[in-house]
C-alpha cells in the first residue's frame, strides 16, 4: 500500500507534535517521560556496576592469587629445586652493572674515611707519621721526613708546610698531636724488606741525594731529643713494590739514622744495626697496627659481602616475582573471559551507555578526544613511549629484552593501530556523525 504524500513533510509534522506534547502534557506523556527517566537511571546504574565488576574482580583475583597461592608455590620451587639466580642474561647484566656501582661507592667511601690513614684510633700520636696514597701506582717513591726538620730548611728544599712531596712522589706525610704512650715499649731491630708476619709489602731502601741540603738525619718517632746535627748525609727513600689500592703502608718508628748495606744480588737492602743504637722497628706496636689493619679490612669485606648478598636476594626475588606475574596475569585473563561470557547483557548495556555518552558530546570535544588518543598511540612521538612500555612489560614477565624484538614490535604494532583508527573513522564515525569527521580533519590540518 502506497503512503500518501502530503503538502507538508512528515518530519515537520512529527516535530510539531513533539513540541505540542511538551507544551501541553497529558497523563500519557507524563508516564512516558517518567519511564524514560527510570530506564536511563537503571542503565547508568547497570553500567557503573558492570564497569566496576570488570575492573575490581580481575584485580582482586590477581592480587589474592599471587599473594596466597602463586608466589608461595613459585618461591618454594625456585629456591629448592634449582640453582639459578637470573631468568635471562639481560637481568644478569643489570645485576652486574649495579654490583659495579656498589663497588665504586664503597671504594669512594673508603677514600673519604681513610684520608689521614689513622686507623680510626681515638689516641693521637706524637712525632709519628702516616703515608697516605692519593693516586698511587706500583713502584711509587716516598720519603720519610720529620716536620720539625722540614720547617727549618731553606727555600730550595722540597719541604712545604710539614709535608714532603717529590716530583715522583704521590704521598703526603702528616704529623699528629702529642701523645707519648703509643711507642713506649722497648724497640728492637727487624728487617724491613721481610715485613712482619709476611703481612706487609716488601720494602727496599736505597740511598739518594734528593735532600742533601738537610742538616739532620731523617728521623721518625723518637721519644728522646734530636740527635747531633750531621752534614752531607744521604736521605732514606723507601719504595713500595707491587702496591695495590687496598694495600696499607707500614707504620715505622726509626730512632737513629740506620746504615744501609746491600744484602744480595737481587738488589734487596736491609738496615744494618748502628753501633750506638739497635732500634729500628717497634715490633709490638707493629703487631697492634697489623691487628687494626686486619680489623679494618675485615669490616670492609663484611660490608661488601652484605651489599652483594642483599643484591643477590633482590634479584632472586625479582625472578620469583616475574614468574608469579606471568601466572597471576594468566589467571586474570581467564577471569575476564568468564566475566565476558557471564555478563553479556550487562556489557551490552555498558557499551550502549558509553556510546550514547560519547555521541552526546559536541563535535569539537569528540574530535579533541580522538586526536589525543591517536597521537598518544600512533603519533610521531609515540615510538619512545612504546619502547619504554615494551621494556617494562618484558621486565614484568621476566622475558629477555631483545632489541630486535622491541624494534619489530615498535615498527608493526602502532601501524596496525593506526589502520584500525582510520577504518573506524571512515566506516562508523563518518556514517553516524559526519560533522565530527569534518571537524577532526580540520583540527589535524
From Swiss-Prot:
**What membrane topology does the UniProt entry give?**
Multi-pass membrane protein
Q: Where in the cell is it found?
A: Plastid, Chloroplast inner membrane
Recorded hits in InterPro entries, A to Z, give: CemA
Gene Ontology molecular-function annotations:
antiporter activity; proton transmembrane transporter activity
The protein's predominant localisation is: plastid
Might you name a Gene Ontology BP term for this protein? potassium ion transport
The residue ranges crossing the membrane are 44-64, 330-350, 368-388, 405-425
A GO cellular component entry from the record? chloroplast inner membrane
Catalysed reactions, as listed in the record: K(+)(in) + H(+)(out) = K(+)(out) + H(+)(in)
Family assignment? Belongs to the CemA family.
User: What role is this protein assigned?
Assistant: Contributes to K(+)/H(+) antiport activity by supporting proton efflux to control proton extrusion and homeostasis in chloroplasts in a light-dependent manner to modulate photosynthesis. Prevents excessive induction of non-photochemical quenching (NPQ) under continuous-light conditions. Indirectly promotes efficient inorganic carbon uptake into chloroplasts.
Question: What PANTHER family does UniProt report for this protein, alphabetically?
Answer: CHLOROPLAST ENVELOPE MEMBRANE PROTEIN (PTHR33650:SF2), CHLOROPLAST ENVELOPE MEMBRANE PROTEIN-RELATED (PTHR33650)
Please give the name of this protein.
Potassium/proton antiporter CemA
The organism's taxonomic lineage, starting at the top: Eukaryota, Viridiplantae, Chlorophyta, core chlorophytes, Chlorophyceae
Gene designation per UniProt: cemA
Amino acid at each position: 500500500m502506497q503512503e500518501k504524500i502530503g503538502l507538508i513533510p512528515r518530519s515537520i509534522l512529527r516535530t510539531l507534535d513533539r513540541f505540542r506534547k511538551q507544551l501541553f502534557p497529558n497523563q500519557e506523556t507524563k508516564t512516558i517521560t517518567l519511564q524514560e527517566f527510570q530506564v536511563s537511571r537503571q542503565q547508568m546504574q547497570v553500567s557503573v556496576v558492570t564497569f566496576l565488576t570488570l575492573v575490581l574482580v580481575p584485580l582482586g583475583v590477581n592480587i589474592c592469587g599471587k599473594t596466597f597461592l602463586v608466589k608461595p608455590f613459585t618461591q618454594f620451587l625456585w629456591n629448592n629445586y634449582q640453582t639459578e639466580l637470573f631468568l635471562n642474561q639481560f637481568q644478569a647484566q643489570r645485576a652486574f652493572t649495579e654490583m659495579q656501582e656498589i663497588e665504586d661507592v664503597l671504594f669512594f667511601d673508603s677514600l673519604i674515611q681513610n684520608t689521614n690513614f689513622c686507623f680510626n684510633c681515638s689516641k693521637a700520636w706524637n712525632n709519628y707519621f702516616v703515608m697516605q696514597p692519593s693516586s698511587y701506582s706500583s713502584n711509587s717513591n716516598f720519603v720519610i721526613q720529620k716536620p720539625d726538620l722540614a720547617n727549618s730548611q731553606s727555600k730550595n728544599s722540597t719541604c712545604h708546610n710539614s709535608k714532603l712531596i717529590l716530583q715522583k712522589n704521590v704521598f703526603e706525610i702528616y704529623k699528629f698531636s702529642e701523645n707519648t704512650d703509643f711507642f713506649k715499649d722497648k724497640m728492637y731491630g727487624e728487617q724491613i724488606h721481610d715485613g712482619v708476619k709476611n703481612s706487609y709489602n716488601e720494602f727496599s731502601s736505597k740511598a739518594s741525594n734528593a735532600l742533601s741540603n738537610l742538616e739532620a738525619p731523617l728521623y721518625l718517632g723518637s721519644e728522646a731529643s734530636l740527635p747531633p746535627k750531621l752534614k752531607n748525609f744521604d736521605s732514606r727513600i723507601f719504595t713500595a713494590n707491587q702496591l695495590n689500592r687496598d694495600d696499607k703502608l707500614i707504620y715505622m718508628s726509626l730512632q737513629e739514622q740506620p746504615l744501609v748495606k746491600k744484602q744480595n744480588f737481587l738488589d734487596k737492602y736491609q738496615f744494618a744495626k748502628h753501633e750506638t743504637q739497635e732500634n729500628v722497628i717497634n715490633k709490638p706496636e707493629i703487631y697492634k697496627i697489623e691487628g687494626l689493619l686486619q680489623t679494618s679490612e675485615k669490616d670492609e669485606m663484611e660490608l661488601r659481602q652484605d651489599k652483594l648478598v642483599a643484591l643477590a636476594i633482590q634479584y632472586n626475588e625479582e625472578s620469583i616475582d616475574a614468574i608469579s606475574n606471568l601466572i597471576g596475569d594468566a589467571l586474570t585473563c581467564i577471569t575476564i573471559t568468564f566475566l565476558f561470557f557471564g555478563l553479556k547483557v550487562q556489557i551490552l548495556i555498558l557499551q550502549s551507555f558509553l556510546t550514547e555518552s560519547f555521541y552526546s558530546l559536541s563535535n569539537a570535544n569528540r574530535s579533541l578526544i580522538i586526536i589525543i588518543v591517536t597521537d598518544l598511540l600512533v603519533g610521531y612521538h609515540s615510538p619512545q613511549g612504546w619502547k619504554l612500555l615494551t621494556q617494562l612489560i618484558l621486565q614484568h614477565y621476566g622475558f629477555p629484552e631483545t632489541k630486535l624484538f622491541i624494534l619489530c614490535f615498535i615498527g608493526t604494532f602502532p601501524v596496525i593501530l593506526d589502520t584500525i583508527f582510520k577504518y573506524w573513522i571512515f566506516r562508523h564515525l563518518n556514517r553516524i556523525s559526519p560533522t565530527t569527521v569534518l571537524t577532526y580533519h580540520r583540527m589535524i590540518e
